[in-house]
């Protein structure tokens, strides 16, 4: 199993960053790597329960993932399971994602994305590239 951790700093208080990374209206602006959009979704990470999204790339290829929001501790953290679906819509290997937010200075926040339980180093590298791209979009939105 492989894990990855990414960190960013935002010039906003934890409450605002938490909203950016959990609420549907904000998630849809940065969810998915650059060049991909959200085609279908049940995407609300602000409360426990099931979630899913289908991304579409520039060529029209679909990429579905889903999971369960396990814990929500506003404005500090949210944790959820993560699994990709294959072409027959069968959900594959399950991993976990955790977003952690803490105050940084008077009005900023440190954001940490921790993705654990990835099946191997190649998967971790692919997710690192994907999440890094997503976070660039989030930085433009929330920066």
Show which residues each predicted segment covers.
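Hydrophobic ligand-binding cavity/cleft-lining segments
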Residues: 1-37
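Hydrophobic/aromatic beta-strand elements that line small-molecule binding cavities or substrate pockets
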Residues: 8, 41, 65-71, 95-103
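A short, structured loop/turn motif at beta-sheet edges
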Residues: 14-15, 70-77, 100-110, 143
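Hydrophobic pocket/interface hotspot
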Residues: 17, 27, 51, 69, ...
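Glycine-rich portal/gate segments that line the openings of hydrophobic small-molecule binding cavities
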Residues: 39-81
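Beta-strand/loop substructures that line and gate deep hydrophobic ligand-binding cavities in soluble
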Residues: 81, 85-132
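Short amphipathic alpha-helical signal-transduction/dimerization elements
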Residues: 135-143
């Amino acid at each position: 199993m492989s894990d990855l951790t990414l960190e960013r700093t935002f010039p906003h208080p934890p409450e605002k960053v938490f909203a950016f990374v959990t609420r549907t209206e904000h998630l849809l602006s940065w969810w998915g790597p650059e060049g991909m959009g959200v085609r279908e979704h049940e995407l609300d990470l602000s409360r426990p329960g099931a979630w899913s999204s289908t991304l579409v790339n520039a060529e029209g290829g679909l990429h579905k993932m889903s999971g369960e929001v396990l814990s929500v501790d506003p404005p500090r953290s949210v944790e959820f399971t993560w699994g990709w679906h294959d072409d027959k819509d069968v959900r594959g290997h399950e991993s976990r994602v955790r977003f952690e937010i803490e105050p940084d200075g008077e009005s900023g926040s440190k954001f940490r994305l921790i993705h654990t339980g990835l099946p191997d180093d190649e998967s971790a590298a692919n997710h690192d590239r994907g999440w890094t791209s997503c976070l660039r979009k989030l930085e433009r939105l929330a920066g």
